[in-house]
């Protein structure tokens, strides 16, 4: 391996590490503490995501958490797309989003106990292929209106979005990584799925655990 190849590998893995660290920022925990709402991990489901932050009763903090969790997936992808050719470096750009997503799920700052990845998943889609983000949002809103289940809406959205990408976006790497992200989201929702199956999953606006 020559010097240029070594530098390229160092550059690539440095980007992945930086993406992971950005994804690891626990905005939900930080914002609830700054707003003196307590430790969000001790509220509701114990999740650090926007849905659980909403259970504090502070809609502004929940909205801010949602936006920041989305943006940390979007920004890293857009920055790398700006610095690299989107066609020649599609696998690197896809992996950058994946590492940011993994950071949210397994943040180093919280002993690798993070969120469920829905907002960051959406953010990665928005940065890499915005029509996928639009499909995700439409599906989520539609099923949320029908069911009032945030978790079920997210699960259906992460199943339908990769199918849409498969038929509309001709990049195998991007599709494979999106499928892996969907699998992670589904696994992270295993408790929600169990409650849905026995009819004990709570809907938005109730006091029981949701996400």
From Swiss-Prot:
One GO term under biological process is: phospholipid biosynthetic process
Q: What is the protein's quaternary organization?
A: Probably interacts with PlsX.
InterPro entries xref list: G3P_acylTferase_PlsY
Question: Which EC class, in a word?
Answer: transferase
* SMART domains tied to this protein: G3P_acyltransf (SM01207)
Q: Under the cellular component aspect of Gene Ontology, which terms does the record hold?
A: plasma membrane
Instruction: Look up the coiled coil feature and give its residue ranges.
Output: none
Q: Any transmembrane segments, and where? A: 10-30, 63-83, 90-110, 126-146, 152-172, 174-194
User: Catalysed reaction per UniProt?
Assistant: an acyl phosphate + sn-glycerol 3-phosphate = a 1-acyl-sn-glycero-3-phosphate + phosphate
Its protein name is: Glycerol-3-phosphate acyltransferase
Q: Which residues form the signal peptide?
A: none
**Annotated Gene Ontology MF terms?**
acyl-phosphate glycerol-3-phosphate acyltransferase activity
Give the family, as the similarity comment puts it.
Belongs to the PlsY family.
What Pfam families does the annotation carry?
A: G3P_acyltransf
Provide the gene name from the record: plsY
Stated role: Catalyzes the transfer of an acyl group from acyl-phosphate (acyl-PO(4)) to glycerol-3-phosphate (G3P) to form lysophosphatidic acid (LPA). This enzyme utilizes acyl-phosphate as fatty acyl donor, but not acyl-CoA or acyl-ACP.
């Amino acid at each position: 391996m020559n010097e240029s190849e070594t530098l390229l590998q160092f550059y690539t893995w440095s980007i992945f590490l930086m993406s992971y660290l950005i994804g690891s920022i626990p905005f939900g925990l930080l914002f609830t503490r700054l707003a003196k709402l307590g430790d969000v991990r001790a509220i509701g489901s114990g999740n650090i995501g926007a849905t659980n932050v909403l259970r504090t009763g502070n809609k502004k903090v929940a909205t801010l958490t949602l936006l920041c969790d989305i943006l940390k997936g979007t920004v890293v992808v857009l920055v790398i797309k700006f610095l690299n050719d989107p066609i020649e470096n599609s696998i690197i750009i896809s992996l950058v989003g994946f590492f940011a997503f993994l950071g949210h799920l397994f943040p180093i700052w919280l002993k690798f106990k993070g969120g469920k990845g829905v907002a960051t998943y959406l953010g990665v889609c928005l940065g890499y292929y915005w029509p996928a983000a639009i499909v995700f949002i439409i599906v989520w809103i539609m099923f949320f209106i029908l069911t009032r289940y945030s978790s079920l809406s997210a699960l259906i959205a992460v199943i339908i979005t990769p199918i849409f990408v498969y038929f509309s976006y001709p990049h195998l790497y991007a599709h494979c990584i999106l499928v892996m992200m969907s699998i992670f989201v589904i696994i992270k929702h295993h408790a929600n799925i169990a409650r849905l199956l026995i009819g004990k999953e709570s809907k938005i606006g109730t006091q029981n655990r949701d996400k």
